[in-house]
């Protein structure tokens, strides 16, 4: 079994992110189950989702031993409760709520062989008593609490692919070490760090000798795209900026469900993809689809099966049986929708093939793409 799992509280800020993640999960046809872990003191009144199954867990907003308020304690705590109460078996794709899919994730992992997004720019060093696990001298206090501090570990982060059996091994220790890092580590300004759970995860995995295969799985929105080339997931932890340097989108300031201005081109492709996903969802909630522009790049959804009968083609999505017959002109349009061409460029290519003007072809192109988007066979990026 394959599970996509993310941990949340029950509040409006987490709700819109959960809805957007769920929408993108459905749009790409991600295999398996989508599970939203909800840390709550009111398990009888869980939030509502269209496709995700909500699972109530005990709230760990505050660490009981220290009184430290840090809602991210809920991540290891909720996972720990889920794996032992439900006893799932299989691969878990572990996400944060501020993630969206632009492609499905097809990789699976076996027990003892997790994979995760490489933590770009992490300055891993030589492990020693003064530099436990190589994660930095500022964590030397871990030698008082951890075993095997002389072992090196590959620095990874969300998204992660990990087997449920490995989660059972590490989640308790991950939670405990998160509390220790929050209690002991201070940055140069004397502050606790927000990323405490990320360092604690690395340390817990090192103790269990659980090395991750570092892969391109999720692009953070403040990274150079080369840090996570062709990543199927966008992690919008940081703002999207335009080529002029202006902020186009920030999760902290976004008001759902407003359209995002597309008049300024985002600096990177993943920014354009994220804005397209958000705007597509805004239109879907309103019962329509986003109008096409010449700069939109249609891309075929994964897993669509093709069957030819004479000069026609049947497209079918096995998961739900959705299907569509395409004639010869529709087939020509479909075959060009690989994400590399925008609508205008598709018109140019078809004009050359059919000896018609782009203006003559435009109605058929727009109608075909509109219908394919309606049934989820195509997605758009800017």
Task: Specify the residue positions occupied by each region the protein language model found.
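N-terminal anchoring/stem segment of glycosyltransferases
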Residues: 1-71, 82-89
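Short catalytic/ligand-binding loop motif for oxyanion handling, primarily in non-cytosolic enzymes
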Residues: 14, 44-47, 64, 100-104, ...
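A structural signal for well-ordered alpha-helical segments within the folded catalytic domains
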Residues: 16-19, 23, 73-77, 195-203
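GT-A fold catalytic core of metal-dependent nucleotide-sugar glycosyltransferases
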Residues: 73-125
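Catalytic core and acceptor-binding pocket of nucleotide-sugar-dependent glycosyltransferases
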Residues: 144-238
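C-terminal catalytic/acceptor-binding lobe
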Residues: 212-291
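Long, low-complexity, charged/polar intrinsically disordered regions in eukaryotic proteins
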Residues: 292-318
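Long, charge-rich, low-complexity alpha-helical segments
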Residues: 309, 319-382
């Amino acid at each position: 079994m394959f599970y996509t799992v993310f941990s949340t509280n029950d509040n409006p800020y987490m709700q819109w992110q959960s809805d957007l993640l769920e929408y993108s999960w459905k749009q790409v046809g991600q295999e398996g189950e989508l599970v939203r872990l909800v840390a709550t003191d009111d398990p009888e009144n869980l939030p509502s989702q269209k496709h995700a199954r909500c699972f109530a867990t005990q709230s760990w907003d505050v660490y009981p031993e220290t009184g430290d308020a840090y809602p991210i304690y809920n991540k290891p705590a909720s996972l720990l409760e889920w794996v032992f109460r439900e006893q799932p078996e299989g691969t878990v794709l572990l996400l944060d709520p501020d993630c969206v899919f632009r492609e499905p994730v097809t990789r699976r992992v076996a027990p003892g062989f997790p994979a995760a997004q490489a933590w770009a720019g992490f300055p891993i060093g030589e492990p020693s008593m003064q530099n436990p696990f190589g994660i930095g001298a500022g964590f030397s206090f871990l030698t008082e609490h951890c075993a095997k501090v002389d072992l090196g570990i590959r620095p990874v982060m969300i998204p992660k692919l990990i087997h449920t059996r490995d989660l059972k091994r590490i989640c308790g220790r991950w939670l405990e070490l998160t509390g220790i890092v929050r209690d002991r580590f201070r940055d140069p300004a004397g502050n606790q760090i927000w990323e405490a759970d990320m360092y604690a995860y690395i340390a817990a995995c090192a103790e269990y000798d659980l090395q991750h295969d570092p892969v391109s799985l999720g692009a953070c929105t403040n990274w150079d795209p080369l840090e996570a080339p062709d990543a199927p997931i966008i992690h919008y932890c940081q703002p999207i900026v335009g080529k002029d340097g202006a902020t186009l989108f920030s999760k902290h300031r976004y008001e759902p469900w407003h359209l995002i201005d597309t008049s300024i081109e985002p600096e990177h492709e993943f920014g354009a993809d994220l804005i397209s996903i958000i705007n597509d969802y805004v239109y879907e909630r309103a019962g329509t689809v986003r109008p096409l522009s010449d700069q939109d790049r249609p891309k075929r959804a994964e897993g669509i099966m093709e069957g030819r009968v004479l000069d026609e083609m049947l497209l079918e999505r096995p998961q739900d049986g959705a299907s569509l017959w395409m004639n010869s002109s529709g087939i020509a349009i479909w075959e060009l929708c690989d994400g590399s061409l925008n609508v205008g460029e598709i018109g140019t290519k078809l004009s050359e093939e059919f000896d018609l003007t782009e203006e003559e072809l435009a109605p058929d192109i727009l109608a075909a793409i509109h219908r394919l988007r309606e049934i989820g066979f195509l997605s758009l990026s800017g």
